[in-house]
């Protein structure tokens, strides 16, 4: 096996955010600067959740322009992630695509999550417990790496793909 010791650089040239404070990075940052809270009292005791102060994301980003083949099979956490990734890519490349500058084999996607897929796992388990059957697509909804897969498909990135789970 031949080793490639050539240094490669990764440059982050854009960022995106969808948070309880705002539907994009600018709105979230402005809310922080205005000392706004991103959490509030939410009673979920009927679901066995003892925490009462939660930060919930009220609205989802528009995924207009995302092909239906990608969009319709994404769980909520992946739709939120794709929305933030679109903001980051827009900041980095404007109206262009990464493929206008780089080979698709040299472009990849690395995403990170700490919770992604767990809510969907709980929903699927509950659905199965109540009905004895659940959607065959739940295997896709519960995968944390569905976000990096969606980004790779959307931008036609054919390089390295990974999802870091904390």
How should these model regions be labeled?
Residues 1-160:
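Conserved "HGTGT" condensation-loop signature of ketosynthase/thiolase-family condensing enzymes
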Residues 163-166:
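Short beta->alpha junction loops
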């Amino acid at each position: 096996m031949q080793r490639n010791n050539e240094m490669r650089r990764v440059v982050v040239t854009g960022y995106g955010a969808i948070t309880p404070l705002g539907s994009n990075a600018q709105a979230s940052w402005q809310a922080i600067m205005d000392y706004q809270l991103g959490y509030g009292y939410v009673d979920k005791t009927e679901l066995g959740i003892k925490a009462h102060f939660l930060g919930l994301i009220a609205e989802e980003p528009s995924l207009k322009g995302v092909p239906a083949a990608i969009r319709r099979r994404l769980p909520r956490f992946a739709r939120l992630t794709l929305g933030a990734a679109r903001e980051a890519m827009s900041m980095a490349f404007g109206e262009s695509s990464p493929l206008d500058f780089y080979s698709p084999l040299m472009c990849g996607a690395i995403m990170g999550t700490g919770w992604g897929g767990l809510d969907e796992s709980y929903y699927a388990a509950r659905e199965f417990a109540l009905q004895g059957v659940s959607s065959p697509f739940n295997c896709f909804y519960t995968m944390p790496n569905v976000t990096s897969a969606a980004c790779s498909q959307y931008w036609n990135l054919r390089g390295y793909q990974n999802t870091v789970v904390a």
